[in-house]
From Swiss-Prot:
This is DNA damage-regulated autophagy modulator protein 1. Pfam families: Frag1. The chain crosses the membrane at residues 15-35, 54-74, 98-118, 119-139, 162-182, 201-221. It comes from Xenopus tropicalis (Western clawed frog). Lysosomal modulator of autophagy that plays a central role in p53/TP53-mediated apoptosis. Keywords: Apoptosis, Autophagy, Lysosome, Membrane, Transmembrane, Transmembrane helix. Belongs to the DRAM/TMEM150 family. InterPro entries: DRAM/TMEM150_Autophagy_Mod, Frag1/DRAM/Sfk1.
Length: 239
């Protein structure tokens, strides 16, 4: 009997959450043990700036971006099929949500590729795209969940998704503002440093948003359990 989180296409959000969480935690543990960052509380990107943890961070976050794109596209196709049956949503709404989500995944790839201290402007742009598009995506998905309730979602699931979305939305604002107010980029933050409290608040909010995304994708598992993914292959003899 397969694990409940592997039924149907549920393996996609399950692997996404496990892999992403492991990517954050592994790079954090390595960077703290080596002494590259203080244990409380670095930015997520700070834990993937210096080698060897930068290699772990880049590899795992790049794969997370691809898993995220695959999960979002599957979610898009599920909603498309459901909408054909009950017509609860304008077609463009689903496409807009997918486009925003995929843009966030591209931002994630930029974060993984361009390290914080090496190319800060590009890295920061990628991070901003990731978090803003990610929050917009889960807000749109929460709205869609309410529109599809009770035919395709329970009211409890809708409330959980909206609660996570609101928390992420609230956290992403101070994350961005206090990041600017904290001043210059550095890895070795100390409580006596100017701007430390801004940095601390921003970093805590960043972790809240990041794991908020993971918690949100966990709620997709139930929806994906009744779905199968098929690959169709055709050979054109005149090619």
């Amino acid at each position: 009997m397969p694990c409940w989180c592997l039924h149907g296409a549920a393996f996609l959000p399950s692997i996404l959450v496990i892999w992403s969480s492991a990517g954050f935690l592994f790079s954090y543990i390595i960077s703290v043990l080596i002494g590259h960052v203080p244990p409380f509380v670095p930015y997520i990107s700070d834990t993937g700036t210096s080698p060897p943890e930068s290699g772990v961070f880049g590899f795992m976050i790049s794969l997370s971006a691809m898993l995220g794109a695959a999960t979002m596209y599957t979610r898009y196709k599920i909603l498309e099929k459901q909408n054909h049956s009950t017509d609860f949503l304008p077609y463009y709404f689903n496409k807009t949500s997918l486009a925003i989500g995929l843009l966030g995944c591209i931002g994630m790839g930029i974060v993984a590729t361009f390290q914080e201290m090496a190319v800060p402007a590009v890295h920061d742009a990628g991070a901003l795209i990731t978090f803003i598009c990610g929050v917009l995506y889960i807000l749109l998905q929460s709205y869609i969940s309410y529109k599809s309730c009770p035919a395709w979602n329970t009211r409890v699931t809708c409330h959980i998704r909206m609660a996570i979305s609101v928390i992420a939305f609230i956290a992403v604002v101070p994350m961005s503002v206090f990041s600017v107010l904290s001043g210059r980029k550095r890895l070795d933050w100390k409580p006596s440093d100017e701007g430390y409290h801004y940095h601390l608040t921003s970093a805590i909010c960043e972790w809240i948003v990041a794991f908020g995304f993971n918690m949100y994708f966990l709620t997709f598992i139930r929806d994906f359990q009744g779905v199968s993914i098929q690959i169709s292959t055709e050979i054109h003899e005149d090619f």
